[in-house]
Amino acid sequence: MTKNKYRTSLDGLVIENPVESFFNYCIERENIRIKRESGEAFPWSEDKIFQKGRFLNVFREDDRVSKSIINFAKPLTDDLPLLIQALFFSRWCNRQETIDKLNHVDLLDADKLKDKLIQLEQWENFNAYPVQDVMWNEKTYSRIDTATTLFYEIKDDLTEIVLDSNLDVIQATKNINKRFKMENDFPIFMALIDIAWFREDVIPITSQVPTGIGAQPYLDRLQEYLGLESHQAVATEMISLQKEYWPEAKRTFYPIDIEYQSCECRKYFSYINGTKKFEGKNRLIVN
């Protein structure tokens, strides 16, 4: 099991109403996205934390990498094994600049794809979630070999595992990681939940999702405040509460959004708590 380095990030910090704070965070972050995309000059918020720290957009489909993945994989919607290969490749890469240089046809030749990636100054994203080596049939594959060779070879196996998981993304993540043996299964989950953008008959967008280590501290706060039995129950309740706290949002939240933004809220309140610093990849740099 992965050691949660974020577990104590909110220790000692009082958040009087974590539900209200969650939605206030989301509203402000979405307003920042709208102002930035409309061409307004920086800063887009009076909040000093938003002026100095990097945060993901509220809705996953608005993130740059997500937009690139959607464009890359969309032609494969009706070919489920290739779609799954494309999404797993994309989440192992997780770098917009790389994905934008490729076409889904590149997936058909693993050797040429690997050569293309090697020629790039940097093909993968080091600044997001960690991507570890993968085991398959007692053989270890590096990140680049997994993304290119392994996913090409096992796309049918992955498809069978996903379909046998009966629309359950949590179970599908566990079933695949029984084979991969990764300490952190988050990249698997990300690739699987991406299927919902294209094939809700395989993974519904309304699926309950596992808790990532980054989201756990804030979901724990929400769970305690709401008096619920699980993080999945928290997601269901927060989706219901959106009508009260943020009725004008551009769409209804799904469970993945609650998990996703709980991670961002943990980051935000970690700055307040002094357990996170505005340095390195955390610092917002506006060009």
Predicted regions and their residues:
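C-terminal accessory module of base-excision DNA glycosylases/AP lyases that mediates lesion recognition
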Residues: M1-I69, I144-Q171, F189, I193-N287
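Alpha-helical ds-nucleic-acid-binding substructure associated with the helix-hairpin-helix region
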Residues: E97-R179
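Phosphate-/polyanion-interacting regions in eukaryotic proteins
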Residues: P43-N125, T159
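Generic structural motif recognizing short loop/turn segments at the entrances and edges of beta-strands
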Residues: L80-Q85, N127, Q132, T252-Q261
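A general structural signal for short secondary-structure junctions and capping/turn motifs
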Residues: P75-D79, R179-F180, T206-S207
